[in-house]
Amino acid sequence: MSCKVKICGLKNREDARTAIEAGADYLGCVFFPPSPRHVEPQNAAEVFDMIGDADVLRVGLFVDPSDDQLMEVLNHVRLDIIQLHGHETPSRVEEVRLNFGLPVMKALPIETAQDVEAARAYDKVADRLLFDAKPPKGATRPGGNAIAFDWNLLTDTSWDSPWMLAGGLNVENVKDAIAQSGCKAVDVSSGVEAEKGVKSPELIEKFIAAVKG
Ligand SMILES: O=C(O)c1ccccc1N[C@@H]1O[C@H](COP(=O)(O)O)[C@@H](O)[C@H]1O
């Protein structure tokens, strides 16, 4: 089975169509106002509408959301997965799953072997895990910073929950990232952009081809 791909930070229909036609397995929209990739719920609904009957999952990315924020988005947008990319505790992850009846993918910041061990508190609690690089000091967002971590930290690790690799992936490094980490799914945002917050159709196509080719 080939490695799955999530294209995150989509803001318009055209980029969504490119990702779907190129073979993306997940599309992601960011609901975090400080991000250059933030979209309003109505806009996200238009992005996800491009999926139609295709076998592609809709992922909503949130950072320490309140139930009110989640409700506001879910009133307008059908999601298949809620991605929590902030400092949510294991009990908050359980609460979100329970309150909204949707699978939760918990993003976990990795820099050292200790960070990998700390992530185990979320294994089985979250439906899926997403390993991303720890953001640099002073960063204005906890992800989407085009920073990679040492993929070998994940080599031969074993998890009950399915997991994805993220953080600084791009057309040049994604094959090595898959080989070293042993991941079965990758997530990219910055690496398929022409400039911050602006996706490049050409890079989306090249990235997916590099993963699946
Ligand atoms: O993309 C963002 O702006 C963002 C904001 C807040 C939290 C996470 C964010 N992005 C996610 O971070 C990882 C890695 O992204 P990158 O490829 O290094 O840019 C990925 O899951 C993004 O969706």
What would you call each of these model-derived segments?
Residues 1-185, 190-213:
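Conserved N-terminal beta1-alpha1 strand-loop-helix module at the mouth
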